[in-house]
Amino acid sequence: MAISYLPAILVPVIGLVMPIFCIVFLFLYIEKESLN
């Protein structure tokens, strides 16, 4: 039963988490580069 609801939960989670993860990764990368 829970498997049918999985895509409905994963799509918004991935849509929110992935951009945040990318922004944080880029921010940390830029900060690291600017320190050197």
UniProtKB/Swiss-Prot annotation:
A GO cellular component entry from the record: chloroplast thylakoid membrane
GO biological process: photosynthesis
Top-level taxon: Eukaryota
Transmembrane segments: 10-30
Cysteine disulfide links: none
Keyword S-adenosyl-L-methionine: no
Coarse class of the protein's main subcellular location: plastid
Keywords carried by this UniProt record: Chloroplast, Membrane, Photosynthesis, Photosystem I, Plastid, Thylakoid, Transmembrane, Transmembrane helix
Membrane topology qualifier: Single-pass membrane protein
Stored InterPro entries: PSI_PsaI (IPR001302), PSI_PsaI_sf (IPR036357)
Compartments it resides in: Plastid, Chloroplast thylakoid membrane
Protein purpose: May help in the organization of the PsaL subunit.
Similarity field: Belongs to the PsaI family.
Matches recorded under HAMAP family: PSI_PsaI
Stated name of the protein: Photosystem I reaction center subunit VIII
